[in-house]
């Protein structure tokens, strides 16, 4: 099980690296799907199946709509793939920043700084919230409505910003 969780964490980091290395949106969506599947699988291995399913459906549903709009707006005849030198340079730079962060984080952990939780004994000592399903339906409703409204507003703002002389996705008829 430990190897499976390490594999999922590696897939999560590689998926995030695939999105952040700035290839064309055609390839970025593959990294997004990889990262979200790995993150939800990680939550599933911790026993939080409902939260994993909700995050998978909401995140992929919302972000894939944004990627569809960005693919429609970025109609490149020759899209950048992960093998291009500029994208490889971004990937190497991000991996370098990750390694420096891990080294600095390791030194800080040796100095006993950082966050200490109640169950901080090992890697799998996580206090699970068994009332998370009830919190989604009781206290979380208002926050979900605010977040949904904010995402809808952000979508229209981005579409209006990239429109450019009535040649974008929102056209005056």
Curated annotation (Swiss-Prot):
Enzyme class, first EC level, given as a word: translocase
Instruction: List the InterPro entries hit by this protein, alphabetically.
Output: ComplexI_Subunit6, NADH_UbQ/plastoQ_OxRdtase_su6, Nuo/plastoQ_OxRdtase_6_NuoJ
State the source organism's domain of life: Eukaryota
GO terms (molecular function) for this protein are: NADH dehydrogenase (ubiquinone) activity
Subcellular location(s): the record lists: Mitochondrion membrane
**Lineage, please?**
Eukaryota, Metazoa, Chordata, Craniata, Vertebrata
Task: Give the way it sits in the membrane.
Answer: Multi-pass membrane protein
Q: Which organism is it from?
A: Fratercula corniculata (Horned puffin)
> What is this protein's name?
NADH-ubiquinone oxidoreductase chain 6
